[in-house]
Design a protein with these regions (language model features):
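Active-site mouth loops of central-metabolism enzymes
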Residues: 24-34, 86-94, 139-143
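CE4/NodB-like, metal-dependent polysaccharide N-deacetylase domain
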Residues: 18, 97-118, 157, 170
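A short, structured active-site edge motif that brings together acidic residues
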Residues: 77-91, 115-121, 204-207
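Beta/alpha (TIM)-barrel catalytic core signal, keyed to glycine-rich beta->alpha loops juxtaposed to Asp/Glu
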Residues: 120-325
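Short, acidic/polar
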Residues: 31-44, 93-108, 185-189, 212
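Acidic (Asp/Glu)-rich catalytic clusters
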Residues: 13-16, 64-78, 105-109, 193-196, ...
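N-terminal binding-site loop/beta-alpha segment at the start of enzyme catalytic domains
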Residues: 1-81, 98, 156-163, 233-234, ...
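Short catalytic-loop micro-motif centered on adjacent basic/acidic residues
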Residues: 49-57, 84, 177-180, 202-205
Length: 325
């Protein structure tokens, strides 16, 4: 991690790739097109320089519109901004990876991506339908491709000048600076890491004090992988972390909001994070974090509640696990 006394400026070096990831990231999972554009601009204005996108979110074009408007206005350069997007489950077949990457680049109006992630380890029936279902409403998985085969195609995006792939794949080379995985367990990550020619640069998973993922975090640190936490505020679900007595008490003591306390904790433990403020005021709040004292970090680490909110690690299908699940 790049040492700085200002947590807002923390950048984490990409060891299995190039560049540095700003620890404070803006997640673009916003269903409304107009709100996506406005919120992305607000986040840039607040100071966010890390943006996490996905084919699945169906709003890459709007994110690109907002980003290009801000870049054109000056004050922010493309080199300052770290952009991630993700390969969706229905494009896991190796022959589909290059086209999916190229389509995301076009929608985002970019000449390169800082990071391209496999959105989940689960392959769905290949095709344009992002959510293929059978007559009983069950997801149709693709049993004809392995995660490692998809990873090899991801590696090809990073490579330069290797023969034996399609012209489309060759044209993408140099446009993908790093690759990684999202919604993966430690058990699934280990064998892929061992087999990978180009190691995963980043692993993105749900993580917060109710789901610290300590073992996965330590594995990532030991192997030069950036740990990127989504849902660091538990999606704002109530009752939840924002109302947790420990977090509320620390916030009052240090003069910050509960959200700011949770985001500072995430950065200070060595992770990057994603948050999705949908207003300018919330973007400014979420960006305005500062160092927590050691006793506050210890109190948060001692929280015993354990809860996973998102079931995607089990099925590849986005959604929330009901309480008690």
């Amino acid at each position: 991690m790049m040492e700085t006394s200002d947590l807002r400026l923390t950048r984490i070096p990409i060891k299995h790739g190039t560049g540095q990831m700003p620890a404070l990231g803006f997640g673009t999972l916003i269903p409304d097109a107009a709100l996506t554009i406005a919120a992305t601009k607000d986040a840039l204005e607040a100071g966010f320089r890390h943006f996490d996108c996905a084919e699945r979110y169906r709003n890459e074009r709007e994110v690109g519109t907002a980003l290009q408007a801000v870049l054109a206005a000056g004050g922010v350069t493309r080199e300052e901004v770290f952009i991630t997007t993700k390969l969706w489950n229905s494009n896991h077949r190796p022959e589909r990876v290059g086209a999916a990457f190229e389509a995301s680049l076009e929608r985002l109006q970019l000449s390169y991506l800082d990071l391209y992630l496999i959105h989940t380890p689960f392959a769905f029936q290949p095709g344009e339908n992002q959510d293929p279902r059978d007559e009983n409403g069950n997801v149709i998985y693709d049993r004809g491709v392995t995660l490692l085969e998809t990873w090899r195609a991801m590696e090809n995006l990073v490579d330069r000048g290797t023969s034996g792939t399609s012209d489309r794949d060759k044209s993408n080379r140099g446009k993908c600076r790093a690759i990684g995985l999202s919604d993966i367990t430690l058990e699934a990550l280990k064998p892929l890491y061992e087999s990978a020619r180009i190691k995963p640069a980043v692993v993105q998973v749900e993580s917060h004090p109710y789901l610290p993922e300590t073992e996965l975090l330590e594995y990532c640190k030991a192997n030069g992988i950036v740990f990127l936490a989504f849902a660091p505020l538990c999606h704002g679900m109530k009752p939840g972390l924002l109302e947790d007595p420990v977090i509320v008490a620390i916030a009052a003591r240090v003069g910050k909001t509960p959200a700011q306390v949770l985001l500072a904790w995430a950065v200070q433990r060595g992770t990057a994070l994603l948050t999705t403020p949908r207003s300018a005021a919330r973007a400014r709040e979420n960006f305005d974090i500062s160092v927590l004292p050691e006793d506050a970090l210890d109190e948060i680490n001692r929280i015993q509640t354990r809860q996973r909110l998102n079931q995607v690690v089990k099925t590849g299908v986005p959604g929330f696990i009901p309480k008690g699940g």
